Amino acid sequence: MAGQTLYDKLWNAHEVTKRDDGSSLIYIDRHLLHEVTSPQAFEGLELANRAPWRLSANIASPDHNVPTVTKERSEGVAGIKDKVSRLQVLTLDNNCAKFDIAEFTINDARQGILHVVGPEQGLVLPGMTVVCGDSHTATHGALGCLAHGIGTSEVEHVLATQCLIQKKSKNMQIRVTGELGVGVTSKDVVLAIIAKIGTAGGTGHAIEFAGQVFEDMSMEGRMTVCNMAIEAGARVGMVAVDDTTINYVKGRPYAPNESQWQQAEAYWRTFYSDDDAVFDSVVEIDGSQIAPQVSWGTSPEMVVDVTQSVPTLDQAIDEAQEEGWLRAYTYMGLEAGQKITDIQLDRIFIGSCTNSRIEDLRDAAAVIKGRKVADNIKEAIVVAGSGQVKLQAEAEGLDALFTDAGFEWREPGCSMCLAMNADKLEPQEHCASTSNRNFEGRQGNGGRTHLVSPAMAAAAALAGHFVDVRTF
C-alpha cells in the first residue's frame, strides 16, 4: 500500500464519515470570522434558534472594512465613515457578544487581518482543519494545516455543527529546488509558480509546496506562498511540519503549555508526506533561476521578471491568451514590449494578508537606506497585518525608517488590497502592491495593480518606477 501525502493524513484525521455520493463529513478545528461574510450566518442561527456548537473553536476580528488612518481608528467603530462598513463591523461586535464568541475588536492590540492573527496568536496549530469566509484561508496551510475558504452558508454550518460536507481534492506537489538568489523572496517564488502553471493549474487539487527552497523558507515566507495557492487555482496550499514550524508555534499565546507540549509536538510531527506517497501531479521548478517578479496585467499569471518586458502577442500560446493580453494592455495602459522598469507608478501599498508580517516590513525597510519616496509617488502606505506586528515593528524602529522616507505608517487592516474600505486607487493609477490579486478594479475602479514583493515595492517607491531590487 502506497504511503500517504500530507493532505491525505489531514483529511483522514478529520473525516467523520463518508457519504454515498463520494463526499465526506469533515470536522473543523478552527473557524475564523470577520465582518463581511458572517452577518447572514449569525442571522441564520438566530432564526433557527441554534447556538454555536463549540464556542472555543471560533475567533473573530474585523479586518476588511476597518479604517487604517490613525485618527479615524482612534474613534473605534464610530470612525468608520462608510455607513455599510460601519454597520458590518458593529454587527460583528453585536453578534459575537450575543453568541459569546471571542473577538479581537477594532482597537484591541491583537486585532488584525485574520490570516496574520491566527498563526501569530497560536490559534492555528499544525494538524488542524481551518476555515474562514475568505478565499485566502489557504495561508494557514503553511503550518501543516488543511485550510481553505468557505461561503456564508458554510459559515453558518460550521457555527451550528462544527462540520462541513466536502469532496476530496487531488494531490499536487510543487517542488522548488536549489537556493534563491539575493533579493528573491517567497513572493517572487509564488508569482513564478503561478506564471508557470497558470491560474487554473491547481484547479481541483490540494497543493503541497516542497523542495529545498521551502525547507529553507521562514514561516512568514511559507504563509505568503500558501496564501496565493488560490491564485494558482487550488483551494488548499500546504507545507509539511518541520523544525521551522515547531519553533514558530512554541510560546504563542494560545499554543499548548509546557505540560502539553511534548505530546502536541509528537503529534504535529506526523504531518508530512511519506517517502512513497503518490501525487496526481508533480511540478518542479529550479529556484536558482527565479528573479524578482512583477505582474504587468490583470491576472496573477500575467507576470514577468523585472528585467523583462510586457510580452508581445507573438509570445501568446493560443488565441484565448492573445485576447486576454489585448484586454490587459488596454486596461493597464501599457504597450506590448514595454520595459517593466519603464512603468511609472502613482501609489505604493505594502500590506495585506500576503505580505504584512514582521519579516515583510523588515525586508521593505532594509531597502530604504536613508532615501526618500520619489516625487511622482502620490501616496506610499505601510499597513501592518496586526496590532502585534505593528508594535513589534515600532519597537524595532521600522516605523521611523518608513515615515522619514515619506511613507505613511497605518493601523492594521486589509486596507488597499481590495476596494472595500477607504484605501483605494483612483482610475488609471498604477500601484506597486504586495497584495495577491490584480484583477480589474480590485484596488479601486479603474485602478491598475502590479503585484510585487515588499522589497520590490519599497524600491519602486524610492525610484518612482519599477527597478531591480538586486542592483538598486
UniProtKB/Swiss-Prot annotation:
One Gene Ontology term from the biological process aspect of the record: L-leucine biosynthetic process
Gene3D superfamilies from the UniProt entry: Aconitase, domain 3 (3.30.499.10)
Catalytic activities: (2R,3S)-3-isopropylmalate = (2S)-2-isopropylmalate
Amino acids binding [4Fe-4S] cluster: 353, 414, 417
GO molecular function, one term: 4 iron, 4 sulfur cluster binding
UniProt xrefs under PROSITE patterns: ACONITASE_1 (PS00450), ACONITASE_2 (PS01244)
Cofactors, names only: [4Fe-4S] cluster
Sorted UniProt keywords: 4Fe-4S, Amino-acid biosynthesis, Branched-chain amino acid biosynthesis, Iron, Iron-sulfur, Leucine biosynthesis, Lyase, Metal-binding
Subunit structure: Heterodimer of LeuC and LeuD.
PANTHER family membership: 3-ISOPROPYLMALATE DEHYDRATASE, HOMOACONITASE, MITOCHONDRIAL-RELATED
This protein's name: 3-isopropylmalate dehydratase large subunit
Organism of origin: Psychrobacter arcticus (strain DSM 17307 / VKM B-2377 / 273-4)
Upper taxonomic lineage: Bacteria, Pseudomonadati, Pseudomonadota, Gammaproteobacteria, Moraxellales
